[in-house]
């Protein structure tokens, strides 16, 4: 566990310092790193969360299976104390755009924070609309 915690922290620190392209290459070369997406979106540093979204946007098409497996860990952040992290997690689930996120989002639809509720509702609508449009996900 110590090794994986250190690796996640190293990735988060690189993300905060703007080394997104290096992180993208790391994820391409080691698919096990996708397990860190949940921890990265839960990071208190906004640059880390923003970088996590950019990372997923960049890798979504090629690595959707690996990213989809991280949905439960990402969804844990829908219960974070910080409402900004909850909203960012909802947004990231929308970027992933996979139907497996819908049960987690449905549980968060009555969040106490109006911005989180709005993010959750928009993400549910987006995933549902796109799923109906293409008949998959």
What are these regions (language model features)?
Residues 76-84:
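Short, mixed-charge aromatic SLiMs
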Residues 8-29, 47-65, 84-98, 118-132:
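Structural detector for internal amphipathic alpha-helices that build alpha-solenoid repeat scaffolds
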Residues 44-45, 81-82, 112-113:
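Short inter-helical turns and helix N-cap capping residues of alpha-solenoid HEAT/ARM repeat scaffolds
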């Amino acid at each position: 566990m110590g090794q994986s915690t250190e690796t996640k922290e190293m990735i988060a620190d690189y993300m905060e310092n703007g080394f997104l392209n290096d992180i993208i290459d790391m994820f391409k070369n080691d698919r096990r790193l996708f397990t860190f997406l949940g921890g990265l979106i839960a990071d208190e540093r906004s640059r880390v969360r923003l970088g996590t979204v950019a990372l997923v946007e960049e890798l979504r098409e090629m690595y959707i299976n690996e990213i989809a497996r991280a949905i439960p860990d990402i969804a844990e952040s829908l219960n974070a104390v910080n409402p900004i992290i909850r909203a960012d997690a909802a947004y990231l689930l929308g970027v992933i755009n996979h139907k497996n996120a819908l049960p987690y989002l449905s549980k968060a639809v009555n969040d106490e924070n109006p911005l989180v509720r709005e993010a959750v509702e928009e993400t549910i609508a987006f995933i549902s609309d796109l799923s109906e449009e293409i008949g998959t996900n």
